[in-house]
């Protein structure tokens, strides 16, 4: 389901396309719910493979959404700066271990709500981690810090508010789940980009 603020905020064709992209990501996440609600075998490797079949497409969808947000907001084609397949390959073992550990705990203890929350968090964390590699490479030489706005008002538990050095920033330029917005400060100017 698309967050309410998205329905209120987006009115132009481009904005509606963005809203649709968010909805597609939500549909990917709904597959996790469907998985969690059905019966499972005791074969951890088999179950992990099924979860990864959901997580990899959702990871790519989430990444593509962030690239679109940056292109719309900053006119920077960040997807050309990041070799997505290469980074995903480098992170494959680590990512699959995280997913396997959570899947194993789910199969053993059966807490589907906790499992869905954990997988959503893994999806958000890994996407932002990969995405930021490209974003920081693009902005680190021209910007020195960023100002995060909306975090306090949005009440997002993952976000902070105020001035943050570029090297310490852990958010994408726009966080679609809570409307936190990051403005990058260009060195030697009073401008935020």
Q: What residue ranges belong to the model's regions?
A:
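N-terminal leader/targeting and assembly helices and adjacent pre-domain segments
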Residues: 1-142, 187-193
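Aromatic/histidine-rich interaction motifs
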Residues: 130-168
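Short Cys/His-based metal-binding microdomains
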Residues: 153-189
């Amino acid at each position: 389901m698309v967050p309410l603020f998205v329905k209120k905020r987006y009115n132009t064709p481009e904005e509606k396309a963005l809203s649709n992209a968010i909805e597609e990501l939500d549909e990917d996440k709904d597959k996790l719910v469907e998985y969690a609600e059905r019966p499972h075998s005791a074969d951890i490797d088999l179950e992990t493979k099924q979860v990864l079949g959901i997580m990899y497409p959702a990871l790519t969808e989430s990444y593509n959404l962030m690239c679109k947000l940056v292109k719309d907001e900053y006119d920077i084609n960040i997807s050309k700066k990041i070799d997505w397949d290469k980074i995903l390959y480098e992170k494959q073992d680590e990512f699959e271990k995280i997913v396997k550990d959570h899947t194993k705990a789910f199969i053993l203890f059966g807490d589907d709500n906790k499992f869905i929350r954990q997988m959503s968090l893994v999806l958000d964390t890994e996407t932002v981690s990969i995405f930021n590699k490209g974003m920081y490479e693009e902005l680190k030489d021209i910007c020195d810090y960023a100002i995060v706005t909306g975090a306090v008002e949005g009440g997002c538990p993952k976000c902070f508010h105020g001035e943050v050095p570029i090297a310490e920033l852990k958010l994408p330029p726009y966080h679609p789940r809570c409307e936190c917005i990051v403005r990058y400060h260009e060195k030697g100017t009073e401008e935020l980009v």
